From Swiss-Prot:
Pathway: Amino-acid biosynthesis; L-arginine biosynthesis; N(2)-acetyl-L-ornithine from L-glutamate: step 4/4. It catalyses: N(2)-acetyl-L-ornithine + 2-oxoglutarate = N-acetyl-L-glutamate 5-semialdehyde + L-glutamate. One of its GO terms (molecular function) is N2-acetyl-L-ornithine:2-oxoglutarate 5-aminotransferase activity. It comes from the Bacteria. This is Acetylornithine aminotransferase. It is found in: Cytoplasm. GO terms for biological process: L-arginine biosynthetic process. Belongs to the class-III pyridoxal-phosphate-dependent aminotransferase family. ArgD subfamily. The modification N6-(pyridoxal phosphate)lysine is found at residue 248. CDD domains: OAT_like.
Length: 403
């Protein structure tokens, strides 16, 4: 035991900003000292309805007075309700609830492998992924992502994942072997730098899967639940996956994840093949249903798209006027990235100085992830602060070199 007065009790796995927030209201976070920040980090795309949304708060309070947790050996009506609503709104026939995106990806991977097994192809267990991907922090999902910085020191890489360069059709086709079970990708890579696969490439991947008897697995943990202006990002390309992992926005801040699949893809996931202690608990299911009450309401997606347009136009103006600071806008809807010329950490700090919270990403990108309830008027206010931050960096870095 160490001296609790001198040693911090938590793992040293986070480089935390010196900010402490006491409460939140809509798109705002308020510190212990009463300072207000516009939260365009949204818990890394989690707080889809902002902070203290009245419908979510009331739903959680009501459910907390009834049931918190039940084992999945019993029927949970709210779980069946949320599952049915997701099925009715998507390609899927079946849903498995988890507590996080990583767990949802684990379920997706197991579902794909199990499908091939019960289809008479036990040799098909490998999953093709794309360089720059991020699929979670479990041993299997860091192997799926393939990034060395997340694999270092954790022993042998879990077998069964093959990375190919981003958007490379030839490499993708060459990676397919008799052992391949499926292809896994994020429609827009989040941590990978807000790199969006072109719609035509997504359609091509769907075609390649069909031609080779493979399953298409989508990681919509960050892109899903309205973040891009449609319920799920793959809808823009008009494709239907076989399996999809979701989390983040579906809970609005409460830890919920889910793996969605067609009946065919899920046919191997029979009793005893997978399980979870907390996944699908009554508290989480109540909140998930409350989130869908709002997200599926008439006019909600239109507001997301209208706010996204305001943000895109404002950020485009900054790229035009401050090319020594930012060079490109990436992403879609309210999943936005600014490709930086200065170090992205400099822009993150400059934004924080202007009381705008943002998130870093790979490829020297800064993510802006406004809550989906952000109005065009609030977006315009935020853009004023963003411009001030960018202008200050421009003055300080008149001849910045590309990082």
């Amino acid at each position: 035991m160490t001296d609790a007065t001198t040693v911090h009790p938590l793992y040293d796995t986070y480089n935390r900003a010196a900010l402490r927030f006491e409460r939140g209201e809509g798109i705002w976070l308020i510190t212990e000292d009463g300072e207000r920040y516009i939260d365009f980090a949204a818990g890394i795309a989690v707080n889809s309805l902002g902070h203290s949304h009245p419908h979510l708060v009331e739903t959680l309070k009501t459910q907390a007075e009834k049931l918190w947790h039940l084992s999945n050996v019993y029927e949970i009506p709210a779980q069946e309700k949320l599952g049915r609503r997701l099925v009715e709104s998507t390609f899927a026939d079946k849903v498995f609830f988890t507590n996080s995106g990583a767990e949802a990806l684990e379920c997706a991977i197991k579902t794909a492998r199990r499908y091939q097994y019960v289809s008479g192809h036990p040799e098909r267990f490998r999953i093709i992924t794309f360089e720059g991907a991020f699929h979670g922090r479990t041993l299997a999902t860091i192997a799926a992502g393939g990034q060395a910085k997340y694999l270092e020191g954790f022993g042998p890489k879990v077998e069964g994942f093959d990375q190919v360069p981003f958007g490379d059709e030839a490499a993708l086709r060459a990676a397919i072997t008799p052992e391949t079970a499926g292809i896994l990708l994020e429609p827009i890579q989040g941590e990978g730098g807000l790199r969006a696969f072109p719609e035509e490439f997504l359609r091509l991947v769907r075609q390649i899967c069909d031609e080779n008897g493979l399953l298409l697995l989508l990681d919509e943990v960050q892109t899903g639940v309205g973040r891009t202006g449609k319920l799920f990002a793959h809808e823009w390309a008009g494709i239907r996956p076989d399996i999809m992992a979701i989390a983040k926005g579906i809970g609005g801040g409460f830890p919920i994840g889910a793996c969605l699949a067609t009946a065919e893809a899920a046919k191997g996931m029979t009793a005893g093949m997978h399980g979870t202690t907390y996944g699908g608990n009554p508290l989480g299911m109540a909140v998930g249903n409350a989130v869908l009450d709002v997200v599926l309401a008439d006019g909600f997606m239109e507001n997301v798209q209208a706010t996204a347009l305001v943000m895109k136009q404002g950020l485009a103006s900054l790229v035009d006027r401050y090319p020594n600071v930012v060079s490109e806008i990436r992403g879609r809807g309210l999943l936005m990235g600014l490709k930086c010329v200065v170090p992205n950490t400099s822009l993150i700090q400059a934004l924080r100085d202007e009381h705008i919270l943002s998130v870093g990403a790979g490829d020297n990108v800064v993510r802006l992830l406004p809550p989906l309830i952000t109005t065009p008027e609030e977006a315009r206010e935020a853009l004023k602060h963003i411009e001030t931050a960018v202008e200050r960096l421009s003055i300080a870095n008149p001849i910045s070199k590309t990082v």
